[in-house]
Amino acid sequence: MTRTPTTSTGHRARPGSRREDIAAAAIELFLDRGVAATRMEDILAAAGVSVGSFYHHFRNKLSLAATVYLEHLQRFQRDLLVELDRHARTEDAVRGLVLAYLRWAGADPRAMRYLALCREPNVAEISEGEEARLKQSFYGRLAGWLDERAATGELRALPHEHSCALWLGPAEQLVRAAIDPSGYSATPDPDTLGAHLAHAERVLADAAWEALRRPALGDDADQAP
């Protein structure tokens, strides 16, 4: 039975540590070639580590691919929840999460590309249990927050999946289009991705707030809850 990698924070990689070097080299290779086509010897050569060093940190190539995915997913979700908790005002939180999503992708396009694009079936299979747990926890936090703000009358009382789609769906779609070379839009250089996404910050934040806020009496907006 295949074990699912976990995102335990018991071992934190230090800047420049061998574990970090292996992970960084592997991501570059996985993004360029795919996990299946990347050879172990290529990872070792790119990271400048020995076989022994590799197996000290990771069980095998698939474990490495899955672990790196889960760690980036956990970091992404954690950073968005930190942003959510920063704001007392509902409008600021709605807007802030959209900005945090776009800025996270712009600051670390390699990690975002890996999260969005590197989901080969054999890697997804061994990480799906932990991935499901992380996503359930993350969206559970968002759902609880949405319920609280709907109860105060500040937000529309929509099904959670509708609210999350209206809130973060446009940012997710824009990011995916920008980092996927097979997408429908021009793919900006990683060095200019942040600026590319920044141009959309206000329009997407405005759209999210307009979609989620409960219209005041007399507004022309849809009055449905």
Predicted regions: what they are:
Residues M1-S17, Y184-T187, D191, A216-P225:
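N-terminal intrinsically disordered/low-complexity leader segments
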Residues R18-D21, L29-S63, T67:
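Helix-turn-helix
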